[in-house]
Amino acid sequence: MQFERADRVAEEIKKEISDIIQHELKDPRICAELISIVKVNMSKDLRHAKVFVSIFDKNRENITSTMKALENAKPYIRREISRRINLRFSPEISFELDDSIEYGARISQILNQLNIAKDEEEEKSQDESEGEQEN
């Protein structure tokens, strides 16, 4: 599959934004346990970048404050992107919270609970049938 230029630029922007967030942003409002850039969607003209951010933290307030800090850091991140990547125009950045990983983990947890309940039920019925055979 041949990548379009927008896809290649999106992947490069994803790497650079991850690096900037991990190593250069010193905002105390970024207090989440783990921040991950999941995906970057670029417009065809490369002027707009929608950055999907996944934030792992049990406290909703930390997630909100981290998103506000990222919004406030947009001018700095945009400037750094233009410095690091050679593009004609520095893309306008918008951050979107992506909770799909958290949602998937929750579904996985529910499925595991169902499997545990099913296993316990099978063990109980097996124990009952063994008890009947002894009589």
From Swiss-Prot:
The organism's place on the tree of life at top rank: Bacteria
Gene3D superfamilies named among the record's database cross-references: 3.30.300.20
Gene Ontology cellular-component terms listed: cytosol
GO biological processes: maturation of SSU-rRNA
Keywords, comma-separated and alphabetical: Cytoplasm, Ribosome biogenesis
A single GO molecular function term of this UniProt record: ribosomal small subunit binding
InterPro entries per record: KH_dom-like_a/b (IPR015946), RbfA (IPR000238), RbfA_dom_sf (IPR023799), Ribosome-bd_factorA_CS (IPR020053)
Signal peptide positions (record): none
Cellular localization per UniProt: Cytoplasm
Subunit details: Monomer. Binds 30S ribosomal subunits, but not 50S ribosomal subunits or 70S ribosomes.
PANTHER family reported for this sequence: RIBOSOME-BINDING FACTOR A, CHLOROPLASTIC-RELATED
Role according to the record: One of several proteins that assist in the late maturation steps of the functional core of the 30S ribosomal subunit. Associates with free 30S ribosomal subunits (but not with 30S subunits that are part of 70S ribosomes or polysomes). Required for efficient processing of 16S rRNA. May interact with the 5'-terminal helix region of 16S rRNA.
NCBIfam families the record matches: rbfA (TIGR00082)
Similarity remark: Belongs to the RbfA family.
Name assigned to this protein: Ribosome-binding factor A
The organism of origin for this protein: Caldicellulosiruptor saccharolyticus (strain ATCC 43494 / DSM 8903 / Tp8T 6331)
Lineage: Bacteria, Bacillati, Bacillota, Bacillota incertae sedis, Caldicellulosiruptorales
